[in-house]
Amino acid sequence: MAGSPSRAAGRRLQLPLLCLFLQGATAVLFAVFVRYNHKTDAALWHRSNHSNADNEFYFRYPSFQDVHAMVFVGFGFLMVFLQRYGFSSVGFTFLLAAFALQWSTLVQGFLHSFHGGHIHVGVESMINADFCAGAVLISFGAVLGKTGPAQLLLMALLEVVLFGINEFVLLHLLGVRDAGGSMTIHTFGAYFGLVLSRVLYRPQLEKSKHRQGSVYHSDLFTMIGTIFLWIFWPSFNAALTALGAGQHRTALNTYYSLAASTLGTFALSALVGEDGRLDMVHIQNAALTGGVVVGTSSKMMLTPFGALAAGFLAGTVSTLGYKFFTPILESKFKVQDTCGVHNLHGMPGVLGALLGVLVAGLATHEAYGDGLESVFPLIAEGQRSATSQAMHQLFGLFVTLMFASVGGGLGGLLLKLPFLDSPPDSQCYEDQVHWQVPGEHEDKAQRPLRVEEADTYA
Amino acid sequence: MAGSPSRAAGRRLQLPLLCLFLQGATAVLFAVFVRYNHKTDAALWHRSNHSNADNEFYFRYPSFQDVHAMVFVGFGFLMVFLQRYGFSSVGFTFLLAAFALQWSTLVQGFLHSFHGGHIHVGVESMINADFCAGAVLISFGAVLGKTGPAQLLLMALLEVVLFGINEFVLLHLLGVRDAGGSMTIHTFGAYFGLVLSRVLYRPQLEKSKHRQGSVYHSDLFTMIGTIFLWIFWPSFNAALTALGAGQHRTALNTYYSLAASTLGTFALSALVGEDGRLDMVHIQNAALTGGVVVGTSSKMMLTPFGALAAGFLAGTVSTLGYKFFTPILESKFKVQDTCGVHNLHGMPGVLGALLGVLVAGLATHEAYGDGLESVFPLIAEGQRSATSQAMHQLFGLFVTLMFASVGGGLGGLLLKLPFLDSPPDSQCYEDQVHWQVPGEHEDKAQRPLRVEEADTYA
Amino acid sequence: MAGSPSRAAGRRLQLPLLCLFLQGATAVLFAVFVRYNHKTDAALWHRSNHSNADNEFYFRYPSFQDVHAMVFVGFGFLMVFLQRYGFSSVGFTFLLAAFALQWSTLVQGFLHSFHGGHIHVGVESMINADFCAGAVLISFGAVLGKTGPAQLLLMALLEVVLFGINEFVLLHLLGVRDAGGSMTIHTFGAYFGLVLSRVLYRPQLEKSKHRQGSVYHSDLFTMIGTIFLWIFWPSFNAALTALGAGQHRTALNTYYSLAASTLGTFALSALVGEDGRLDMVHIQNAALTGGVVVGTSSKMMLTPFGALAAGFLAGTVSTLGYKFFTPILESKFKVQDTCGVHNLHGMPGVLGALLGVLVAGLATHEAYGDGLESVFPLIAEGQRSATSQAMHQLFGLFVTLMFASVGGGLGGLLLKLPFLDSPPDSQCYEDQVHWQVPGEHEDKAQRPLRVEEADTYA
């Protein structure tokens, strides 16, 4: 059948029909279920409500834009390093995020703010949806270059649901604290993508090996992503934190942790680099692990030193992961991890979760004072000891790994459905499969400006 | 005369003298008329004024930076797609915006805040000036590559005045609501530029056709502009909206609309694409129309579903416009629209205005409650019915199209003045006409690092 | 000895060991001395403290992100113009800033917030540390391409200390006002770097001349830096200014000054350009001097006209500096200034300091009213006359130039230590010395997608 006209037409229509179906279904669900919440609806909001308590909410607004910038500019450009896959990297980032934002508004709405037959949305819904889109884009990094856009939309369809359930179980059923999402975003997104990539393992991928590297200017584009992730990570971790000490502490810890992971990354990259030379892949990725590793604990009393130590550890572990573990992951575990999400999100996410276990276990009424209520409400209310909170945090990590692994496995099976359009082994990491691509250089017909011409214009 | 030394000197001096004259004249007018307003002047502001009402003002501050980012990064980089016109695209964006900001501060100041013989400026003046600069840059997109910098400055000189008057007529005389500027910014900027481009029609433009496309990495630079426009559009539409439900609703509606226009664009681009392949031009532009189409109505009770539907419609219409209408626009209507502003701003702007007519016509006291005063003050005060407001909105669109068309026509005649420097037909879309341009590649003399050399350094 | 295996190993280990040592030492000092301040510590912050006075603090949060964006995106990408040094430009920006942030937190902490045996850190510490990192990156611009990363870290180690002391002397001992840092950041950073570059003078640098220019797309990357600096400069100058009129005025003055410097730059660039063509180097740099020149005075009652005049002057002087003075600086004064920091930060910084002298000398109780206390507290309290404040401002400039020159000289001697790794004259401006660099173009083995292949995928 392959190559027959009808099949080709079917394949050509896959993406448009799926987009139209998903957008149509989402729109119908929005029409039936989604309503503005009381802080967004004209009729429910009153100027007289404008109190300090509401102030808290207004401050969210700039944070939302910071998170938004981080997800789109950051994740989008971090993936353009491939020499012939830049269109797909930023383009599919856009596509996936645009769908994930809508779909997770619905999923999270049903889980968290469904009452009176309606989901109630506001600025917080946007931030939560952006977080979920972040997890989907992390998974995208693992399968980058080896999947078509229709496959990716189906991946997002499944992953958004499991992300929402996992987050609900952790935050609401288990009382786990994870403000910046070391577990819910990074660990979940990374292992979901890695297991999925394992199921989609391509033994013949070396046919596309010559396209798997970067070129000089694609690495510079990638640094745009890196820098935006680096600068906005303090806002990302603090985006849903209540105003005041907690938000300041979260930003400060994240900032210190990133600074230390950067120095750790440079040290290790030069140490293990051929002839002492630095590797751009390490700087682009491992330097960011400081943001991941304090995702769970940045709101806690981690101390500035604790933030530095955590960031440094993450940066070094991640760099070593790129150098030594990624090749093993492919050769022994048959996991082809295009962007190295295991090193940027997987290991640092797990480390971050464990750091959260440790810091939670050390929490005392003395160290947190009145702030205990906002950081560990269940301890403050006497429902849990610090040790019990630590155990719950650990169990949360376990749950996340389960959801991610089972979900990634299911996702892999879904994406293997034979009628789905997937690039052949010899055409992975290649924009031309999905895009009309212009040449790399300007038209050869172009001539330099000649003096006669310059003189004759009107 | 052409080619004679004196003429060449005259042409060389055109840009510097115009810059110096415009800057000098602006500075004199600033010296005579512009003063800090009471929220900016040291002597007029008192700490005791620091009330909730003022809070509203402080919150503007981050929004100002968001709008600023959107106008400069967004519009600047959205136009670098041309393979040999990147310097001019970002450079002239800078030049035009820097002049438009000053000039529109004066024009808008005379129209809106002139009392006691002075214009009073503050943070709101900056946001309003940025909006006006946005409209000028939209018009720039229509004539991109076919006009010199001196011509562009003259275009801005005229357009800023007409923008100010049109906005004044709509918002102050007609009581039209247009928070995000579907009419005042997008429709006005697009049709001003399109009519101007019509007057400047070049029948021989195919002489520069080989330079009219993009190259691989120029398309990636363009995606920087796209992403920044996408992420900051919620702030752009909400920048001048009062705090509270209205601002949240504006951001939320814009966000949903953009998500839907993105999915609609991918669907249609793949559907009409050759061999089912996506076209980067569609993604770079049509995916943004969700922000344009809710410009008038995003503050209204559009409902989340309404935002999705509007965005989807705009994305699909815009994509179809790029595919089918832009060629007709050139061949039949003799409008050469370099960036396709008709598809990104023109049609979506008109659609957005009509959507505003519809949503305004459906406004009820029930749906808006206490919020009616801030969204439709004239309806709330009983001076107008919803239907009457809708009619005023429609008339506002008509006025905008008139101002834009007549203004664009006048602008075209102005730019055709024979002594103005304009690139010849064979040198359109070419940086070398205006800039000292380095080569595309590093010096051929460069040699790879040899081992002996590496070993001999101190 | 050169070229011997042991020496090569020693050189290879320099960067990793220095990174590890500096990170280790910083971490120990953090462990001993650094604590959260009362607005960041869970136990010290109380919800009941949430007053208007605190509000002031919360508003800092978005400004922090703006400053952060400006320092990293702005300075990082402004330096990628060199055709073969993009990795080092953004990479070492990252490295230097990550170290400077930590180290200046300690240095500034000891000088400003050391009590009870501890340094107390919060959001303001982050902004102050970012400012210091900015100065270090300015100095980096002077020596860009001619120094290795270990040398740069040592430079930062010294510069951060002197930056902190100079700032302390100016702001706390002399009562100098310098909100946006014309003196403390720009003048200090520039002359520190220039004197250092003088000490490191390389008579044989023409061996690397062929690598010293830009290529077409590296100039576009640089424009990313330029635009981010331009848009966030109002926030940068206003970041540590108290809320209210002062902050608005600072932003407004900076905005006007930048607009005028942009027009002045275009005018002069076209005027002095070969054949009337614009030079991208001028636009990338001189257009930004409007932000530098009002660094000292933007919070003062400069008036909108004053801001325009100052910006215009800075833009023209800076453009002329690039054209005429930079070559003399190298040939006569033996200062090799890679990025032209003398034109972007040096001269405009000194001009900004002198403008501050003038505006301070003209201060009257009438013009400032109640705002005098926040702008010139010592004049408001009657401890100083306006003339005396002006003299102190002038003396502050003198002190800054002293600290910068002596510091830069010491720094140069430090960096000349013979065992430090430095690129040879023939390998300056070359990434390959420090990085594993991929090719400029995609693998030649890559073939276009053939139809048979496209048809055979699963």
UniProtKB/Swiss-Prot annotation, chains A, B, C:
<feature type="topological domain" description="Cytoplasmic">
    <location>
        <begin position="146"/>
        <end position="149"/>
    </location>
</feature>
<dbReference type="GO" id="GO:0035379">
    <property type="term" value="F:carbon dioxide transmembrane transporter activity"/>
</dbReference>
<dbReference type="Pfam" id="PF00909">
    <property type="entry name" value="Ammonium_transp"/>
</dbReference>
<dbReference type="InterPro" id="IPR024041">
    <property type="entry name" value="NH4_transpt_AmtB-like_dom"/>
</dbReference>
<feature type="transmembrane region" description="Helical">
    <location>
        <begin position="150"/>
        <end position="170"/>
    </location>
</feature>
<feature type="transmembrane region" description="Helical">
    <location>
        <begin position="87"/>
        <end position="107"/>
    </location>
</feature>
<feature type="transmembrane region" description="Helical">
    <location>
        <begin position="347"/>
        <end position="367"/>
    </location>
</feature>
<feature type="transmembrane region" description="Helical">
    <location>
        <begin position="220"/>
        <end position="240"/>
    </location>
</feature>
<feature type="region of interest" description="Interaction with ANK3">
    <location>
        <begin position="416"/>
        <end position="424"/>
    </location>
</feature>
<comment type="similarity">
    <text>Belongs to the ammonium transporter (TC 2.A.49) family. Rh subfamily.</text>
</comment>
<feature type="transmembrane region" description="Helical">
    <location>
        <begin position="305"/>
        <end position="325"/>
    </location>
</feature>
<feature type="short sequence motif" description="Basolateral sorting signal">
    <location>
        <begin position="429"/>
        <end position="432"/>
    </location>
</feature>
<feature type="topological domain" description="Extracellular">
    <location>
        <begin position="171"/>
        <end position="178"/>
    </location>
</feature>
<feature type="topological domain" description="Extracellular">
    <location>
        <begin position="108"/>
        <end position="124"/>
    </location>
</feature>
<feature type="topological domain" description="Extracellular">
    <location>
        <begin position="35"/>
        <end position="61"/>
    </location>
</feature>
<feature type="region of interest" description="Disordered">
    <location>
        <begin position="439"/>
        <end position="458"/>
    </location>
</feature>
<feature type="topological domain" description="Cytoplasmic">
    <location>
        <begin position="1"/>
        <end position="13"/>
    </location>
</feature>
<feature type="topological domain" description="Cytoplasmic">
    <location>
        <begin position="202"/>
        <end position="219"/>
    </location>
</feature>
<feature type="transmembrane region" description="Helical">
    <location>
        <begin position="125"/>
        <end position="145"/>
    </location>
</feature>
<dbReference type="InterPro" id="IPR029020">
    <property type="entry name" value="Ammonium/urea_transptr"/>
</dbReference>
<feature type="transmembrane region" description="Helical">
    <location>
        <begin position="179"/>
        <end position="201"/>
    </location>
</feature>
<dbReference type="GO" id="GO:0016323">
    <property type="term" value="C:basolateral plasma membrane"/>
</dbReference>
<keyword id="KW-0325">Glycoprotein</keyword>
<keyword id="KW-1003">Cell membrane</keyword>
<feature type="topological domain" description="Cytoplasmic">
    <location>
        <begin position="415"/>
        <end position="458"/>
    </location>
</feature>
<feature type="topological domain" description="Extracellular">
    <location>
        <begin position="368"/>
        <end position="393"/>
    </location>
</feature>
<dbReference type="GO" id="GO:0030506">
    <property type="term" value="F:ankyrin binding"/>
</dbReference>
<feature type="topological domain" description="Cytoplasmic">
    <location>
        <begin position="273"/>
        <end position="282"/>
    </location>
</feature>
<dbReference type="GO" id="GO:0008519">
    <property type="term" value="F:ammonium channel activity"/>
</dbReference>
<keyword id="KW-0813">Transport</keyword>
<dbReference type="InterPro" id="IPR002229">
    <property type="entry name" value="RhesusRHD"/>
</dbReference>
<feature type="transmembrane region" description="Helical">
    <location>
        <begin position="62"/>
        <end position="82"/>
    </location>
</feature>
<keyword id="KW-0812">Transmembrane</keyword>
<feature type="transmembrane region" description="Helical">
    <location>
        <begin position="394"/>
        <end position="414"/>
    </location>
</feature>
<dbReference type="GO" id="GO:0097272">
    <property type="term" value="P:ammonium homeostasis"/>
</dbReference>
<feature type="glycosylation site" description="N-linked (GlcNAc...) asparagine">
    <location>
        <position position="49"/>
    </location>
</feature>
<feature type="topological domain" description="Cytoplasmic">
    <location>
        <begin position="83"/>
        <end position="86"/>
    </location>
</feature>
<dbReference type="GO" id="GO:0072488">
    <property type="term" value="P:ammonium transmembrane transport"/>
</dbReference>
<keyword id="KW-1133">Transmembrane helix</keyword>
<feature type="topological domain" description="Extracellular">
    <location>
        <begin position="241"/>
        <end position="251"/>
    </location>
</feature>
<feature type="topological domain" description="Extracellular">
    <location>
        <position position="304"/>
    </location>
</feature>
<comment type="subunit">
    <text>Interacts (via C-terminus) with ANK2 and ANK3; required for targeting to the basolateral membrane.</text>
</comment>
